[in-house]
Amino acid sequence: MEERIRLSILLDIYGELLTEKQRNVLDLYYNQDLSLAEIAEHTSTSRQAVYDIIKRCHMLLVHYEDKLNLMEEKKNIEENKKGIIDFIDSLYSDKNAEVLDKIKNYIMNNI
């Protein structure tokens, strides 16, 4: 996975663990694709301060994922959910279609 996309996902997962300013800077950098100079102008800080925040938070987000593995867990859950849905699709017949649709909808919406 491209590092920029990975960091954007980590920001979504662990963003609440950062300060509001850190979240804002990272959102502008990773999700809005602004340059360091644009972020500095937008936040009324220096380009160097923006760079430092991004580097520090990058390390923090990677550290959180190394310890908690929430992104990996989410990926595994989605893969397992897809496997279950594929299995349910293989069981379809005219007699059980309604029940299987209810099971699929429950899995897709609640797990």
From Swiss-Prot:
InterPro entries attached to this UniProt entry: RNA_pol_sigma_r3/r4-like, UPF0122, UPF0122_fam_protein, WH-like_DNA-bd_sf
Signal peptide: none
TM regions (residue ranges): none
General function of this protein: Might take part in the signal recognition particle (SRP) pathway. This is inferred from the conservation of its genetic proximity to ftsY/ffh. May be a regulatory protein.
Pfam families from the UniProt entry: UPF0122 (PF04297)
Organism: Clostridium kluyveri (strain ATCC 8527 / DSM 555 / NBRC 12016 / NCIMB 10680 / K1)
Protein name: UPF0122 protein CKL_1400
Family, similarity comment: Belongs to the UPF0122 family.
NCBIfam families from the UniProt entry: PRK00118.2-2, YlxM
